[in-house]
Swiss-Prot record:
The modification Cysteine amide is found at C60. Cardioregulatory neurohormone that increases heart beat rate during adult wing inflation; has no effect on beat amplitude. The effect of CCAP is both ino- and chronotropic. It comes from the Eukaryota. One of its GO terms (cellular component) is extracellular region. Residues 116-171 are annotated as: Disordered. GO terms for molecular function: hormone activity. This is Cardioactive peptide. InterPro entries: CCAP. GO terms for biological process: neuropeptide signaling pathway. It comes from Periplaneta americana. The lineage of its organism: Eukaryota, Metazoa, Ecdysozoa, Arthropoda, Hexapoda. Disulfide bonds join C54-C60. Central nervous system; most neurons exhibit coexpression with burs. Keywords: Amidation, Cleavage on pair of basic residues, Disulfide bond, Hormone, Neuropeptide, Secreted, Signal. Residues 1-26 form the signal peptide.
């Protein structure tokens, strides 16, 4: 019975808390506005004071408001155009050197492949020994059952090898 009173008391307390919450009004909660200094706001929004911009082409440390390649061309000044043309010319020369080195490497590789194919091609003129004939020769002890040499009468040698292979094993 006491458990019933505890559960009833807790339920009543929770009900009172839930019913009391809507009575709180927005006036009771005070929200303070932050004071913003106009000088600080101007400093934050000033386009000249942006953070440095980093990318793969220009690197880091240059501000976005600094002169870029586009503004150099717009200035129509002779030194800026000369600087830009020198930079483009050096990049073109570097690209050409890279391409020439690539062509040279491919040419050398092709020559090596041709030399290797010529070396292997020259060795293909002579007949290769048959490994089965050598194996059979070692296996059989008596000279009559040996297979003939690979360079003599090839069709007869292969037929004899086939006969030896198909013979039943006897001990």
């Amino acid at each position: 019975m006491q458990m019933y009173h505890v559960v009833l008391g807790c339920s009543l307390a929770i009900l009172l808390v839930i019913l009391d919450i809507p009575q709180a009004s927005c006036d009771d909660v005070v929200i303070q506005k932050r004071q913003v200094d106009p000088a600080e706001m101007d400093r934050l929004l000033d386009p000249k004071r942006k953070r440095p911009f980093c990318n793969a082409f220009t690197g880091c440390g240059k501000k976005r408001s600094d002169e870029s390649m586009g503004t150099l061309v717009e200035m129509n000044s002779e030194p800026a155009v000369d600087d830009l043309s020198r930079q483009i010319l050096s990049e073109v020369k570097l690209w050409e050197a890279i391409q020439e080195a690539r062509v040279e490497l491919l040419r050398r590789r092709q020559e090596q492949l041709q030399q290797q194919s010529n070396q292997f091609g020259a060795g293909m003129d002579r007949p290769l020994p048959l490994p089965i004939a050598g194996y059979r020769r070692k296996r059989f002890a008596d000279p009559e059952s040996q297979a003939p040499a690979p360079h003599s009468n090839l069709p007869r040698a292969t037929s004899q090898l086939q006969e030896e292979i198909t013979k039943p094993w006897s001990r």
